[in-house]
Amino acid sequence: MHDAFDFVMTEHAAWQQADGGAQRVFALNDGGRWLATLQDGRLTLDRLSGAGVEPVRDVFTTPKVFAGVPELATSLRSLGSVVRFRNADLWDAIGTSIIRQVIRAGQSKKLYRAFCRAHGEKVALPDGNSYALFPAPEVVLGLSDDQFSSHGMAFKRRPLKAAAEAYLEHGAKWRELAPDTLIAELQSVPRIGPWTAHATVADWSNEWSLYPYADLAVRTWAKRAAPSHDWPADEPAFGQTWRALAGEHLCSLTLLTLAWGSQHGDIG
């Protein structure tokens, strides 16, 4: 690892606690499996299987010219440089966003991890333990109603199965699309709406200008990072304010605000 950074975002449910730090296995489209480990501020990547390149990561910093809300700028600059890995698996990104719909962040992580442990591919780790990936679309399609219900996922059964069927048919094409085009394609799938499509593509591409930036997570952490600022209370007004405030820095401002939340709480 040669990146210079101060903070690594581990908000995705696939990051799991391990020996006082965090770890995540990335499943790449070329068949490679990579283990990312974060411990004592040190990030390491180990190839577990396959060949090909490492999972892609991007570094974000607060723009020097950003001064629209000084209190917010100060909070975000306290993070320093922030690293976030792109979700290498579009199917995982879709499934994660579906599980995250309309439930609390902490609960969505519990559901995601239990679902992975029960039905996901088990990847052997160097320490002798194993790591469970998100269940493949073929597996999801084969699960019974009772299997969903046993993990508290009954209300996610239909959207996950619809997404799995669509991914098996269109996934190869989707992975080649530009992020904004992919958003429209995803919304052609039953039960995938704007929030899910935008959140999925942001996770997959790290293009956070496409994230639904007026959602509860951004509103919550913007208000906590800059409590003295008079933020609009309702979602549409906040979205307009946020877009105007960010200008050309919408991607970095949104990601860094979520990173600030990741450092100070649980945003899912």
Residue ranges with predicted function:
Residues 1-268:
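HhH-family (HhH-GPD) DNA N-glycosylase catalytic core used in base-excision repair
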